Amino acid sequence: MTLSKKIFIGISTIIILFIGFVFWLFFEIANENKGDEIFYNIKIPENLNFDKPIESLTYQQIDSLTNIEVNDDKIVVIGDGYSGYDFYMWHKPTEKGELYIKAFELTQNIQLSELELSTRTENEITELGENYKLYIGNSLIYEGTFANYYPVRFELWFKPKNSEIEKKLTEKNYVIDGWDR
């Protein structure tokens, strides 16, 4: 085989690989949000009340959350699909264990970002007390896309240290948007 044939075969191989890479890249980008279509154009039920999370809090507002007087377990969600959501959870720590958030799309009851959400919002309760205490977590919601709002039920859960049985403590409905990958 002559040198010119070897060069031609080498250049042809590089061109074919480059074209294959471009097609693969196009396919990946086109299918990036595949599956998120079920979160587009969801009708928000009119018979339920929903809050839309405030996008952010000032440092002073965040500091003031510790002074809120609470008489029941409570969840407040702050943020958006772009930068993620902050979860402020109030709970009276009468038992050692783990406190965390679960989220469900409300009309189809689909659990959202199951592993990430429970892991990133998990707070270990080691000190017990008679007063409600503020716990904080942060996570993205991966399902959906920016500016396509859909109804979500956020639930506060507790799992005792010496048991695998989870207990749902409270829930709150919001309309949120997801994170574009």
Q: What does each model-found stretch correspond to?
A:
Residues 162-181:
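Short beta-strand elements
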Residues 91-95, 105-109, 156-162, 178:
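Beta-strand elements of well-folded, non-transmembrane domains
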Residues 54-100:
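Contiguous beta-strand segments within globular domains
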Residues 95-137:
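Extended, solvent-exposed segments with strong compositional bias
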Residues 1-19:
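N-terminal Sec-pathway targeting helices
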Residues 37-56:
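Short extracytoplasmic/periplasmic juxtamembrane "stem" segments immediately C-terminal to an N-terminal membrane anchor
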Residues 119-162:
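Short, solvent-exposed, Trp/other aromatic-anchored flexible loops in extracytoplasmic proteins
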Residues 17-43:
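Membrane-interface motif at the C-terminal end of an N-terminal transmembrane signal
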